Swiss-Prot record:
Keywords: Cell wall, Cell wall biogenesis/degradation, Disulfide bond, Glycoprotein, Membrane, Secreted, Signal. Glycans are attached at residue 30. It comes from Arabidopsis thaliana (Mouse-ear cress). Residues 172-253 form the Expansin-like CBD domain. GO terms for biological process: anatomical structure morphogenesis; plant-type cell wall loosening; sexual reproduction. SUPFAM superfamilies: Barwin-like endoglucanases (SSF50685), PHL pollen allergen (SSF49590). InterPro entries: Expan_Lol_pI, Expansin/allergen_DPBB_dom, Expansin_CBD, Expansin_CBD_sf, LolPI, RlpA-like_DPBB, RlpA-like_sf. PROSITE patterns: EXPANSIN_CBD, EXPANSIN_EG45. It is a peripheral membrane protein. Belongs to the expansin family. Expansin B subfamily. This is Expansin-B5. The keyword Secreted applies. Induction: Possibly induced by cytokinins.
């Protein structure tokens, strides 16, 4: 009897520990240090830079939850598309700046931004957000600045992950972009499970778009398993792409990565 009780107690401890670890919110990048980068800006003064960015987010960058707070990244940030979706905190010490950090997401590529080892080509809205009240245009008129930056957790409260199916997708070729991911913001692996099938790994394109060409027609509904790039956390968007799906459509899931505590 004592042996059975001990085994039961041990099982409960292991199970409790498992859930404590599994359900713990993402605390990614809290311990990263501030480094130096260069910034410029492009597009309209209060705009998103462009809605045709290389990452493939389209006009979503101008809407909730991104609200134009995005940036093109130089080669060290864009990382041949693997940097798409990553979030960064920036702060500026110029007299026109508030010195309070802002947060931006990488949504585009700036291949010519190589003057510094790390360079953000910000949207006009994001560049101006660094400024003191009423000083946005004066700051933008400077054109170029040095800032401090560090990697940050993406945080989109009350927003679930969405799957934006590519306009060229068909039963033999599935491709889509994942939007609104909390935490790391980008992915180490994305897998698709068609109806009655097994999970299949997708190929990351040079953007936030992932694709799969299985050689046979795929039928929905589809489960999507997402593995976060840095933390390695996994979530499954069950049935997020329905049986009767359409190319170009956006499908909203019921899941997202846990939102972390406030960063310093």
């Amino acid at each position: 009897m004592a042996s059975s009780s001990l085994k039961c107690f041990s099982f409960i401890v292991v199970l409790t520990t498992f859930f404590a670890i599994s359900l713990k919110p993402c605390y990614c990048h809290n311990k990263t240090h501030w480094n130096t980068a260069g910034i410029t800006w492009y597009g309209d003064r209060e705009g998103p830079g462009t809605t045709g960015g290389a990452c493939g987010y389209g006009d979503a960058v101008a809407k909730h939850p991104y609200r134009c707070m995005v940036s093109a990244g130089g080669p060290s940030l864009f990382k041949d598309g693997k940097g798409c979706g990553a979030c960064y905190r920036l702060k500026c010490d110029h007299p026109l700046c508030t010195k309070k950090p802002i947060k931006v997401m990488i949504s585009d590529e700036c291949p010519g931004c190589t003057k510094e080892s790390v360079h953000f080509d910000l949207s006009g809205k994001a560049f101006g957000a660094l400024a003191k009240r009423g000083k946005g245009d004066q700051l933008r008129n400077l054109g170029e600045l040095k800032v401090s930056y560090k990697r940050a957790c993406c945080k989109h409260p009350k927003t679930m992950i969405a799957i934006h199916v590519d306009a060229g997708a068909n039963p033999y070729y599935m491709s889509f972009a994942v939007k609104f991911a909390n935490g790391d913001g980008n992915f180490a692996c994305i897998e698709v499970q068609p109806a009655g099938g097994q999970y299949m790994k997708m190929e990351e394109m040079r953007s936030a778009v992932w694709r799969l060409s299985p050689g046979v027609p795929l039928k929905g509904p589809f489960n999507i398993r997402l593995t976060s790039a840095v933390s390695g956390k996994k979530i499954i968007a069950k049935g997020v792409i329905p049986e009767k799906w359409s190319p170009g459509a956006i499908y909203h899931s019921k899941v997202n990565f846990p939102v972390q505590r406030k960063q310093k």
